[in-house]
């Protein structure tokens, strides 16, 4: 019986590997003619398919050692060097929130061993909250904080922790004109910061070196990365990714390379919505 089970398991693993390889070829062919980014260059790209896709289709953050991913209802943890997922939590939305209608995990941010997740309901987006997970285990800590509806009328697609200021930022999804600033400990609103220009369809954001970087899913396919001065609200284009209108931009994170320079890691859903890509960029000279 054991030998038979072992044989079946080996065959199953080989079949899964073959299917994954075929899917990687297909999604690679879909994206082979993507124009080069403007203002940055691609370092590498990791593609996730099959089961891993459902762990990586929404948000990403990092703590310098690991990536933390979100799918619509799942969480994943990966080695920051290889991108290989080694820990998951499925059905990560707590039961008490599901009973209230929450059904979608969006962008992530993390600090001090806690992953902060933007979670919303749908399709009317009547409720939004920040849910706290343990970064080691990816388990719910028992803490969540509802967000004010008048500042999140289209849900909360992302959140970003500012460790230096002890803040957490959010914004409206469509044509956001202000940055919402909450106290990291209490999630009470501190202030709003007017932005120098609207930012549309922000899907993820992360702080790096005192600046807030945003990944936007503009429908024209440019998919800009914006840099926001959180003191003045000034918004500038950091670089343009040019991944195409068929690709859906998702979350992003930033970490420092061995020289202290930023590495931008941007998550996308493939044109067929059967794969996700984590692309690493460095700014052009």
Name what the model sees in each region.
Residues 72, 120-122, 171-175, 217-219, ...:
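Short loop/turn segments immediately following the C-termini of beta-strands
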Residues 45-49, 87-101, 140-154, 193-198, ...:
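Surface-exposed loop and turn segments in beta-propeller and other repeat-based domains
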Residues 85-119:
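Blade-loop segments of beta-propeller domains
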Residues 48-73, 104:
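Beta-strand-rich domains and repeat architectures in extracellular enzymes and scaffolds
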Residues 35-54:
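A short helix->beta-strand "capping" segment at the edge of beta-propeller domains
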Residues 197-230:
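Loop/turn-rich, solvent-exposed surfaces of beta-rich toroidal or solenoidal domains
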Residues 54-61, 98-107, 150-161, 198-206, ...:
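Repeated scaffold domains used in trafficking and secretory/extracellular systems
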Residues 74-79, 124-132, 176-181, 220-227, ...:
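Structural motif
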């Amino acid at each position: 019986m054991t030998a038979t089970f072992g044989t079946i398991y080996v065959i199953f693993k080989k079949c899964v590997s073959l299917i994954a390889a075929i899917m990687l070829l297909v999604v690679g062919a879909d994206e082979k003619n993507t124009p080069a980014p403007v203002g940055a260059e691609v370092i590498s790209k990791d593609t996730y398919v099959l089961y891993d896709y459902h762990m990586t289709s929404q948000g990403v953050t990092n703590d310098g050692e690991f990536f933390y991913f979100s799918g619509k209802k799942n969480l994943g943890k990966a080695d920051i060097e290889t991108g290989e997922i080694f820990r998951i939590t499925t059905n990560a939305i707590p039961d008490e929130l599901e009973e209230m209608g929450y059904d979608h995990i969006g962008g992530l941010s993390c600090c001090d061993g806690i992953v902060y997740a933007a979670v919303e309901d749908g399709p009317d987006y009547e409720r939004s909250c920040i849910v706290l997970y343990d970064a080691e285990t990816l388990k719910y800590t028992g803490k969540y904080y509802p967000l004010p509806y008048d500042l999140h009328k289209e849900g909360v697609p992302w959140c970003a922790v500012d460790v230096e200021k002890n803040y957490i930022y959010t914004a409206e999804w469509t044509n956001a004109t202000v940055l919402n600033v909450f106290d990291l400990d209490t999630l009470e609103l501190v202030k709003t910061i007017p932005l120098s220009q609207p930012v549309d369809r922000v899907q993820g954001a992360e702080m790096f070196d005192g600046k807030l970087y945003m990944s936007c899913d503009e429908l024209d396919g440019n998919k800009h990365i914006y840099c926001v001065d959180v003191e003045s609200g000034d918004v500038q284009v950091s670089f343009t990714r040019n991944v195409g209108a068929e690709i859906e931009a998702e979350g992003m994170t930033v970490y420092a390379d061995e020289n202290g320079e930023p590495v931008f890691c941007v998550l996308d859903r493939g044109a067929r919505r059967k794969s996700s890509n984590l692309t690493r960029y460095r700014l052009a000279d």
